[in-house]
Amino acid sequence: MGQKINPHGFRLGITTDWKSRWYADKQYAEYVKEDVAIRKLLATGMERAGIAKVEIERTRDRVRVDIHTARPGIVIGRRGAEADRIRSELEKLTGKQVQLNILEVKNAEAEAQLVAQGVAEQLSNRVAFRRAMRKAIQSAMRQPNVKGIRVQCSGRLGGAEMSRSEFYREGRVPLHTLRADIDYGLYEAKTTFGRIGVKVWIYKGDIVGGKRELAANVAAPAGDRPRRERPSRPRRSGATGTTATSTEAGRAATATADAPATTEQKEG
């Protein structure tokens, strides 16, 4: 059920990669708990920074943390003060040397997590939920790499007594197609009526051959990339799309073309 499962987990190893990359034997549970604590630490107090995703990579004595953010200036701080504070807190949490990389997200309106966060902030500021959803969809569809988007809000929408879910969609969002590049984001809006969950799916086209073939094609020069050619099919004739030998007219034309020429035709 591609409509229910998390799109990232559904496509792991096919078109998406893990956001935590390390190997552990007996310390597996400890590392998972540590990763959750790192992500929670970076999420609290950094709402204005627009953090799209956090990637964690571990070696024997070092932890590398990549923060993808739409506003790197807020994460770095004045003269790097904020980045130094974050690094010291992470080193205190992990007990290892931390390499902190702050990467800028160029196209924030095409990132599902940032779109969901933007809609949630508008809901917290008492903006009508339908207006916030439509505005986010229009902004995302203006981006050249976005082929489709779906935005869903769940909770006491408009202060109603009974909670419900509503969604708007524009373009294609094939959630069950494994080769589809689906970006997914989730954020909660804190309102006076309670929490409202915002989910965003953004379709950015198909990745043919999976992430390994995509990486190989990007790395290879343009002349070395394999050409994709159309498969050969039998020629068709007639308005109904039938093959040349499946109708009486087609069979007659084929028989006439294959028959030997008569004496009169040769003399003419």
Curated annotation (Swiss-Prot):
The record ties this protein, via HAMAP family, to:
Ribosomal_uS3_B (MF_01309_B)
Q: Does the keyword rRNA-binding apply?
A: yes
Q: Where is the KH type-2 domain?
A: 38-106
Segments for region (Disordered) = 218-268
Which keywords fit this entry according to its UniProt record? Ribonucleoprotein, Ribosomal protein, RNA-binding, rRNA-binding
Family named by the database record: Belongs to the universal ribosomal protein uS3 family.
Keyword RNA-binding: yes or no? yes
Query: What organism, scientifically named, is this protein from?
Result: Rhodococcus opacus (strain B4)
Q: Where are the compositionally biased (Low complexity) regions?
A: 237-268
Pfam families membership: KH_2, Ribosomal_S3_C
Q: Which domain of life is it from?
A: Bacteria
Query: Which SUPFAM superfamilies is this protein grouped with?
Result: Prokaryotic type KH domain (KH-domain type II), Ribosomal protein S3 C-terminal domain
Q: Which GO terms describe its biological process?
A: translation
The protein in question is named Small ribosomal subunit protein uS3
Cite a GO CC annotation. Answer: cytosolic small ribosomal subunit
Q: Which GO terms describe its molecular function?
A: mRNA binding; rRNA binding; structural constituent of ribosome
**What is the annotated quaternary arrangement, including any partners?**
Part of the 30S ribosomal subunit. Forms a tight complex with proteins S10 and S14.
- Which gene is annotated as encoding this protein in its UniProt record? rpsC
Summary of the function given for this chain in its UniProt record: Binds the lower part of the 30S subunit head. Binds mRNA in the 70S ribosome, positioning it for translation.
